[in-house]
Amino acid sequence: MRTDIKNSLDVVATLAPAAQTATATGTAVDLANYDAAAVVITTGAVANAAFSIEIQESNASGSGFTAVADADLDGSEPATLTATTVTVIGYHGIKRYIRAVATDAGTGDASFGVTVIRGKGRVKP
C-alpha cells in the first residue's frame, strides 16, 4: 500500500496558469514553517514568445526581491519556455519568500503557470 503525501505538502500558485502576452510578476509565497520548497513551471502552447523565468527571493513579502543564486537552486531556470513541458526546480535558499517573474522578450504569447510546492512542514498544512 502506498503512503499519502497529500497531507505532507502544500501547493501554492505564484503565477496562475494563463495565456501571457507580457512580463508578469508572481505573488510572494511564504516559506515560513516549511523546510523544503520546489518551483514547478508548466507550459502549454507557446507562439512567437521568448519568455524566461527567474525565481526571486526576499525576507519581506512586498519588497527587496532579488534573483536566487544558482547555488541555491537544484535545476535551472528556463532561459526560454518550450511548449508542453514541466520543469521542476528545487529551492535551497534561506529567505522567507519566493516568487517567479516571467519576462517576455518576444512578441507573441505563451500559456503557462508557476507553482510552489512547500514540503517538510513543521506543522501539517
Give residue spans per PLM region.
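C-terminal interaction-tip segments
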Residues: M1-A13, N33, D104-P125
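Surface-exposed beta-strand edges and flanking loops
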Residues: N7, L31-N33, I55-E57, A83, ...
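Surface-exposed ligand/attachment interfaces on beta-rich extracellular proteins
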Residues: L15-A32, A45-A67, E77-T85, G106-D109
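Noncatalytic modules at the cell exterior or secretory-pathway interfaces
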Residues: D35-I41, Y91-D109
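Short, solvent-exposed aromatic-acidic interface loops
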Residues: A71-S76, G121
